[in-house]
Amino acid sequence: MFSLLTIFSCNPKKNQSETHQNTSFEEISFKYSTKNKNFVSAHRGGSGIHGFPENCVETFEHLYQKGIQIFEIDVAETKDNQLILMHDNSLQRTSTGRQDVNQVDLKTIKEYFLVDDFGQQTSYKIPTFAEALNWGKSKPIYFMVDIKKSVDYRDIVKTIEQANMQKQVVLVTYTIGQAKKLHQLVPDMLLSVSMRNEREFNEMMNSGIPTDKMVAFTGTRRNDKTFLNKIHDKDILVIFGTLGNLDKSASTRNGQLYRDLEKDGVDIFATDRAIDVHQTINKN
């Protein structure tokens, strides 16, 4: 999912049944420090929650009330060139629509309802990218924006700038080419860049992109602590994806895996179990 952090320093602990008191902007920095706390990035804006679909503003609000302040979201483009939140090429899995996203205009898409990960229809609508940004604008939250292949980077940037949300967005990249292109377009914005191994680390160090504009995504396979320390030595935060099998494994081990990864040097957990991970890493 930046120098998102002085990573959430000194969060007050509350009973899990209560609304969590979120960290303020003043307590957040995306530059690595040994004083940082770890935090969670909700994959697809929150998944695996009964009654709350992925890439849904109401899900963001639900998780925000539980202490989640980082949301990885997917931005796609409709037939009439409008930006919406949608992971798949097709509307079918996560909404009552059946067509491909690029075959339907926004007016039609707004007639559909979102479906949760258990196949249950909700009353929630598919949000536009602008609507999602507007929700987050008044809150100490951050979006990690995963841009679908058909979407023009310039349209993404224009929407972010119109919302004045440049400081609350991290743009997700998967290749050094994408990272260079986006950095050239918006040199002041943060980028999530791939650093899964020594080769990718060296490529990024020689890319010309300042390290203070990087957050390192180290993949979904566990790296050794020495490699993560090398990233930290550049004052770059480490994001690790526990999506899929690792989240499933952790759920059977009382969250011990997350604590082990924390000791390894993981700063940001990209996860499908946002609430569980947040509670685990914030226990006394």
Label every model-predicted segment.
Residues 10-284:
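Phosphate-group recognition and catalysis centered on beta-loop-alpha active-site segments
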